[in-house]
Design a protein with these regions (language model features):
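Helix-turn-helix DNA-binding motif, specifically the short coil turn and the N-cap/start of the second
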Residues: 63-66
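Pre-recognition alpha-helix immediately N-terminal to the DNA-recognition helix
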Residues: 40-43, 102
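N-terminal leader segment of winged-helix/HTH proteins
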Residues: 1-36
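Short, locally clustered residues in the helix-turn-helix/winged-helix DNA-binding domain
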Residues: 43-47, 108, 135
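Charged, amphipathic alpha-helical coiled-coil/dimerization segments
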Residues: 72-129
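C-terminal regulatory/oligomerization modules of transcriptional regulators
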Residues: 1-2, 6, 128-154
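Short helix-coil-helix linker/hinge
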Residues: 31-38, 97, 123
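Short capping segments at the starts of secondary-structure elements
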Residues: 48-52
Length: 154
């Protein structure tokens, strides 16, 4: 297997495992199933506070219709609530409930454990190389995403 094939195999496996483990970890912490999209919604709101529906949809790369369905599920699970803006009644913000805040903190702790487990075994030089490599991968994904958005609007 070439280096490129190994890297591809590693990335495909890693992305799949991260999603699967995140969903299972969160379900265990919440006591109910939760999708990766729902996790990302909670993460976005937890990091920023009350957020407009349209902003969340753009940030996590889903349509407003998809977000609405996911938010309906999160409301039913008691993790988020919809709040109309006092300044503009047309605007709906999504905010975390106390249970949603606990889910956000639980998810954040999972990520901290994941990163710590990697960094604990690397030298500062290896950490720098890993960060540079992941930054290049992130740049690729951003370029692909921008190209896709251009195709959708053009």
């Amino acid at each position: 297997m070439t280096g490129a094939e190994q890297l591809n195999s590693f990335l495909v496996d890693m992305f799949g495992r991260i999603n699967k483990i995140e969903e299972r970890t969160m379900a265990g912490g919440l006591g109910s199933a939760i999708s990766i999209t729902e996790i990302h919604i909670i993460e976005k709101i937890g990091a920023q506070g009350p957020v407009r529906m349209s902003e969340i949809a753009k940030s996590i790369g889903v349509t407003l219709a998809t977000l609405t369905v996911a938010c309906d599920k999160l409301v039913a699970k008691g993790l988020v609530r919809r709040v109309r803006s006092l300044e503009d009644r047309r605007v709906v913000n999504i905010t975390l409930t106390a249970k949603g805040r606990a889910a956000y903190e639980y998810h954040k702790a999972f990520h901290e454990r994941m990163i710590a487990s990697v960094l604990d075994s690397l030298s500062p030089e290896q950490t720098a190389v890993l960060a540079q490599s992941l930054e290049k991968l992130q740049d690729f994904f951003r370029q692909e995403e921008a190209a896709m958005e251009g195709e959708e609007h053009g």
